[in-house]
């Protein structure tokens, strides 16, 4: 099977993944998003690029991977969320928290699989601008993904909002 055929099967499976799947598949189709494979470090299952492409970690995924796998589909939804957020928001703990909560809520709704304790704590956090919550979120993400997942290098807020907070003490609204 070619990568293009596999990607089409992935989008078909995403469309069958409920209302959210249909929305995200439509987004990917409308933008003709390239979905490929790239070997990266073990703490990264997938990533997006500023060019609007999505890559799955070739260490974990290949053309042999089941496109209907709920873990794969929710991971794809996570990356699409980052494309929707844009470069600045996606590169913040705030953006990561939104994508992680979306991914794992959907995964556990669809599979009812037992949750890792760090994911359970992450899902219990209120999504918003509270800096203490965002710091906790980063800790839970690293507990789950490992220290090689460098969320600790990201600003808590999208960069412009982070700078405003640090200069003027103004929390985003």
Region spans (language model):
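Short pre-active-site segment immediately N-terminal to the catalytic Zn-binding motif
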Residues: 56-75
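Extracytoplasmic/secreted cell-surface and envelope-processing proteins
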Residues: 64-65, 84-85, 94
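Pan-zinc metallopeptidase signature
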Residues: 134-173
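Post-HExxH zinc-binding segment in Zn-dependent metallohydrolases
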Residues: 92-128
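Short, surface-exposed coil-to-beta transition loops
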Residues: 49, 68-71, 93-94
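Auxiliary, metal-adjacent structural segments of Zn-dependent hydrolase domains
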Residues: 1-55, 61
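Active-site recognition of the HExxH zinc-binding catalytic motif
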Residues: 74-87
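Charge-rich, solvent-exposed alpha-helical interaction surfaces
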Residues: 9, 13-16, 79, 118, ...
